[in-house]
């Protein structure tokens, strides 16, 4: 299986609801679900390499589900940007798991979250009142923790929501690499593939600005050859308004959020793996050490030469996750 299937799940909100897209790899009949949730400006196809590694490690008996968090990828954009926040996203994840459970009962639920996806995972795994059909069995947190370095947040804030318009996929990839070299070493081909799903042809924007594409297409892929060069101009896939709550955050709100995240982390009982880029500027060594000593006492794996955040394109990074999930 070299390409995932794309589905949509209706989610509740105060404006009549929104659709969340999700990509599914593996056996749709499997009772073992691995939910992989991406970072702030990313989308579900970030996990293509990891998903295939998980399916191979499980001998095919697994469903790997990679949503496009609302406001990204194929998912709808919210009418009220103030709700682009972790608690809202976590509610959508519960809706998604309920949908998966209704289609085929879920016996084992594992969770992998990168950056923002990891913070969502703290809520999903640590909030005892969430109506999940099954609890999180194993949790992987990728380069994030309850305490976030303010300078790193300021760095991220300089580019989130700035948009971008590119004539070619290569131009888009080069522009994104200038902002994302902390992801660590990638070949030009690997980076181009990661970038392919980060842009959408301007002609495919719907009236509200979001990407409304055919069910069997990906944002930068025309129908037919998935490696074909998309027609420009190309735009970034996400709603620029995801930056609104990010930029309105105050020091007081940040302190309250940090305390709440530590409380959630301390409530987690699932075995937890923390993957950290050794040169990460978002999660410090001190925070990683705290996460190893309290709450679920995470096992910490670091990758040298990588900052924020590991992409799991490197086989060694994927192997760390599959070993944790299956050994």
Where are the regions a protein language model picked out?
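Active-site glycine-rich loops that stabilize anionic/oxyanionic intermediates
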Residues: 39-42
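Conserved hydrolase catalytic core segment
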Residues: 106-150
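Short beta-to-alpha linker loops that shape the active-site pocket of alpha/beta-hydrolase fold enzymes
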Residues: 68-73, 145, 304-307
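Alpha/beta-hydrolase fold catalytic core
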Residues: 1-35, 56-63, 102-105, 316, ...
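Catalytic histidine-centered segment of alpha/beta-hydrolase-like enzymes
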Residues: 306-315
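Conserved serine/cysteine hydrolase catalytic core
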Residues: 200-293, 302
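Helix-rich cap/lid subdomain of alpha/beta-hydrolase
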Residues: 144-238
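Active-site loop/oxyanion-hole signature of alpha/beta-hydrolase fold enzymes
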Residues: 14-15, 49, 55, 63-112, ...
């Amino acid at each position: 299986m070299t390409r995932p299937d794309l589905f949509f799940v209706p989610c509740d909100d105060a404006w009549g609801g929104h659709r969340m897209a999700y990509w599914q790899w593996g056996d749709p009949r499997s009772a073992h679900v691995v939910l992989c949730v991406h970072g702030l400006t990313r989308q579900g196809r970030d996990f293509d390499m990891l998903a295939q590694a998980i399916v191979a490690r499980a001998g095919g008996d697994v469903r790997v589900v990679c949503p496009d968090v609302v406001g990204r990828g194929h998912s709808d954009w919210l009418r009220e940007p103030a709700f682009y926040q972790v608690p809202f996203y976590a509610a959508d994840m519960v809706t998604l798991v309920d949908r998966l459970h209704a289609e085929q009962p879920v016996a084992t639920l594992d969770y992998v979250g990168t950056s923002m996806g990891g913070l969502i995972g703290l809520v999903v795994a640590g909030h005892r009142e969430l109506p999940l059909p099954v609890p999180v069995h194993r949790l992987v947190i990728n380069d994030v923790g309850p305490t976030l370095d303010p300078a790193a947040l300021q760095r991220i804030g300089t580019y989130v929501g700035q948009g971008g318009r590119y004539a070619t996929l290569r131009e888009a990839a080069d522009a994104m690499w200038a902002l994302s070299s902390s992801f660590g070493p990638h070949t030009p081909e690997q980076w181009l593939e990661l970038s392919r799903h980060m842009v959408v042809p301007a002609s495919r924007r719907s009236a509200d600005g979001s990407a409304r594409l055919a069910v069997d297409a990906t944002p930068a892929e025309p129908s037919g050859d998935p490696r074909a060069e998309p027609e420009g101009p190309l735009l970034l896939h996400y709603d620029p308004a995801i930056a609104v709550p990010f930029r309105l955050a105050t020091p007081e709100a940040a302190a309250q959020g940090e305390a709440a995240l530590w409380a959630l982390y301390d409530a987690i009982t699932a075995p937890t793996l923390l993957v950290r880029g050794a040169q990460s500027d978002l999660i410090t060594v001190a925070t990683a050490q705290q996460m190893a000593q309290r709450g679920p006492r995470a096992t910490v794996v670091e990758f040298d030469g990588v900052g924020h955040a590991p992409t799991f394109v490197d086989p060694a990074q994927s192997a760390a996750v599959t070993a944790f999930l299956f050994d």
